[in-house]
């Protein structure tokens, strides 16, 4: 029988109770605030704030609190380095890449914390758990600022090769700290052939083999950790850049970015956009023609 223990916020507990209020049932345990009998699972909410979910459907109901079960795929139960990047699709902000080293004995802690793919977590949740991950998990974080990004793109790198360089460097630096992974997984952003081609121009190399896997953040906790930390780093950078210019910079590359880009261009010229945005995006031309 599956058993999951979580410590969600009181707000999330109340939202869960409201959603499943018809399943509330009495309990003789004085330490249980609320007890719910749900299809294929029972949920005990303790006075301490902890929640115990038991039964075949435990994972389903735990997902309400951000819990994400990680498939027991090949290599998941090995000491593992996983990498991911955030910011590649956003006009404003830098490009954050993180490599994290996770061992099997850390899996329960990470699952209880609610670690999953950063794409499924709210920014608020990411900002909440990222500091804990940074403290507890060995990792290497890199941030390429927009101005530095603009400097290297079109010169030595393109949008793909620069990510190869950053992923490679993050792994290299993490290995230099003495971690000993039995597997290294990169959340695939290009083919293995392309990765190897661009890797050939990098000076820092290592002998460990790597595996590029699509949707790796949903398969490996090490990649999920990197995804969360990278998202947090990107959001922090976005806030700092916007604060310096006096604008709230949106994530992404949609119409909201077009509008702010036009305003920054009028206020600061191209120097302002070079400071906070990736200039090769189409948003730049739209701002010029606005």
Swiss-Prot record:
Catalytic reaction list: Endonucleolytic cleavage to 5'-phosphomonoester
Keyword Cytoplasm tagged: yes
Sequence positions that bind a divalent metal cation: 84-85, 187
Domain of life: Bacteria
Alphabetical list of Pfam families matching this protein: DUF3378, RNase_HII
Compartment list: Cytoplasm
Residues of the RNase H type-2 domain: 78-290
Cofactor stoichiometry and binding remark: Manganese or magnesium. Binds 1 divalent metal ion per monomer in the absence of substrate. May bind a second metal ion after substrate binding.
InterPro entries linked to this entry: RNase_HII/HIII, RNase_HII/HIII_dom, RNase_HIII, RNase_HIII_N, RNaseH-like_sf, RNaseH_sf, TBP_dom_sf
Keyword terms: Cytoplasm, Endonuclease, Hydrolase, Magnesium, Metal-binding, Nuclease
GO molecular-function terms, A-Z: magnesium ion binding; RNA binding; RNA-DNA hybrid ribonuclease activity
EC number per UniProt: 3.1.26.4
Principal localisation: cytoplasm
Biological processes annotated in GO: DNA replication, removal of RNA primer; mismatch repair
An annotated GO cellular component: ribonuclease H2 complex
Function: Endonuclease that specifically degrades the RNA of RNA-DNA hybrids.
Family: Belongs to the RNase HII family. RnhC subfamily.
Protein name: Ribonuclease HIII
Species of the source: Streptococcus pneumoniae (strain P1031)
Primary gene name: rnhC
